[in-house]
From Swiss-Prot:
Biological role: Modulates intracellular Mg(2+) levels to maintain cellular integrity upon Mg(2+) limitation. Acts by binding and stabilizing the Mg(2+) transporter MgtA, thereby leading to increased intracellular level of Mg(2+). May inhibit FtsH proteolysis of MgtA.
Impact noted for substituting residue 21 to A: No change in activity
Coiled-coil intervals: none
NCBIfam families, sorted: small_MgtS (NF033842)
GO biological process per UniProt: cellular response to magnesium starvation; magnesium ion homeostasis
Keyword check for Transmembrane: yes
Keywords: Cell inner membrane, Cell membrane, Membrane, Stress response, Transmembrane, Transmembrane helix
The protein's name: Small protein MgtS
Top-level division of the source organism's lineage: Bacteria
Lineage: Bacteria, Pseudomonadati, Pseudomonadota, Gammaproteobacteria, Enterobacterales
Transmembrane feature ranges: 5-25
Subcellular location: Cell inner membrane
Record GO cellular component, one term: plasma membrane
């Protein structure tokens, strides 16, 4: 169970980080 939770947290973090990067760069390119 703990292993699955670790993987879930890692995937969630990557998705959130990717979304943050996408938003950051899209705002940057709007200029």
């Amino acid at each position: 169970m703990l292993g699955n939770m670790n993987v879930f947290m890692a995937v969630l973090g990557i998705i959130l980080f990717s979304g943050f990067l996408a938003a950051y760069f899209s705002h940057k390119w709007d200029d």
